[in-house]
Structure formats: structure tokens, C-alpha cells
Amino acid sequence: MTRNIEEIRGEFIEKIGLMAQADGLPRIAGRMLGLFIWDGEAVAFGDLANQLQVSRGSISTATRILEDRRLIKRIAKAGQRQDYFQLAENPYAQMLEHYVLGLERVQIEIAQTLGEIPTNEADIKGRIEAYGAFYRTMSGALSKLADDLKAG
């Protein structure tokens, strides 16, 4: 039996919400992102609240987060008083760049810890250095992927 496209759309939006929540974002922000990815068009602020069946306050918080991460952008439509939002250009590169920033913060913490380990603790230092190398490698790989996505 084939499923209704609206059913599939709803499940997709919910899945993106759950994935975003697992990454530390509000579930509503993920649901909004899923809606923008699926629909591919600008949506009025009030329509977001109606379509996702959440409060305008939740939409306001989520739009700020998604705008700060440069995943969506606010646009104006002639003759319309409310704000519209749409998927930003190259949002997936922006996602990767956000992850890279997080990895860089971890690297700083690891480096600070390394600086405090006495030189006579070579085994500990070696394990911590390997852990730092893991984060440097991930950061470099994600940076390259972001650059590749930007280049098209």
C-alpha cells in the first residue's frame, strides 16, 4: 500500500525534530528545519506556528536559534506585515561549520589539560594527545566537507 505524501512529510518533519533534539537543539527547531527542507519555500511566522501546532513563543525561540546558526533566513514580502523565513543558502555547510566550532572548543580544553600534565606522566600524556589528534582530524575533515559543500 502506498502512503499519502502528507503522512510521509509529517514523519520526515518529526524525524528531523528528533535528530535535532539528539544534537542538543530544541525539537521545534528541528521540526522547523524539516519543514523548510521538505517544502522548499518561504513560510510566514504565523503559518509556522499553525503548521507545526506549537506556540508562537516556541517558533520565536526556534527561529532565533536557526537564524543564529545560519540555517534559515528572514525575508520580507512586499505588502506583508509579518516576517517570512526560508532555508538559508548552503545550510548544510553551515551545519558542518557549527560542528567544527564545537570540535575546536573541545581541542582547546584538551590542550589546556595537556599543559597541566607533568612531563613524567608520559603514558597519560600520550593517551590525551591521541584524543586531541582525534578531534583535530575530525575538525579538519568536517572543515574540508564544509568547503566542498560551499564550492558546490
Each language-model region and where it sits:
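Short, cationic-aromatic polyanion-contact patches
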Residues: 23-28, 44, 77-97
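Glycine-centered, phosphate/nucleic-acid-interacting loop/turn motifs that mediate DNA/RNA or nucleotide
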Residues: 70
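N-terminal leader segment of winged-helix/HTH proteins
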Residues: 1-23
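C-terminal regulatory/oligomerization modules of transcriptional regulators
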Residues: 116-152
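Short helix-capping/hinge SLiMs at alpha-helix to coil transitions
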Residues: 22-23, 37-40
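A short acidic, leucine-rich amphipathic alpha-helix
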Residues: 47-50, 66
